[in-house]
């Protein structure tokens, strides 16, 4: 009987320790890349200033990426419409973002992590547009 109680207490302790230390099995945020964007742009109906940005994937956020302006200390969650397959995964590149330019406004369209295979489609714009790529050097 005492051995069953000891085994049960050991099992409960093994399950409880991660919660006591705040490690409930969730992974920490993953920084996917940094880019210096030289112009203001629109994302999720919000205008963002030019500056240095980092893109972070946080577990538990589902299909969202966090876009963080490192200078202004502001951030916004961006919905991922779909994943984009890399056409040449062997080619090395820095993190890059793609913008759709419509008239004089630029809209965030895609994000590609540094040296990773797949990208993220973040926005779709209708009508005539021009693509502009900003890549981390």
Segment roles from a protein language model:
Residues 1-9:
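Bacterial N-terminal signal peptides that target proteins for export
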Residues 23-42:
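Short acidic, Pro/Gly- and aromatic-enriched capping/linker segments at domain boundaries
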Residues 9-18:
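Bacterial N-terminal signal peptides
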Residues 81-137:
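Beta-strand-rich cores of mature extracytoplasmic or soluble domains
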């Amino acid at each position: 009987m005492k051995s069953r109680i000891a085994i049960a207490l050991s099992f409960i302790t093994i399950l409880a320790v991660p919660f006591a230390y705040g490690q409930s099995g969730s992974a920490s945020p993953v920084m996917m890349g940094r880019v210096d964007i030289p112009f203001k742009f629109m994302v999720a109906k919000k205008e963002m200033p030019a500056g240095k940005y980092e893109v972070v994937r946080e577990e538990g956020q589902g299909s969202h990426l966090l876009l963080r302006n490192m200078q202004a200390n502001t951030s916004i969650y961006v919905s991922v419409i779909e994943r984009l397959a890399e056409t040449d995964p062997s080619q090395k590149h820095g993190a890059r973002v793609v913008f759709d330019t419509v008239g004089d406004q630029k809209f965030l369209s895609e994000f590609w992590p540094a040296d990773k295979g797949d990208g993220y489609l973040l926005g779709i714009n209708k009508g005539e547009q021009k693509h502009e790529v900003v890549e981390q050097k």
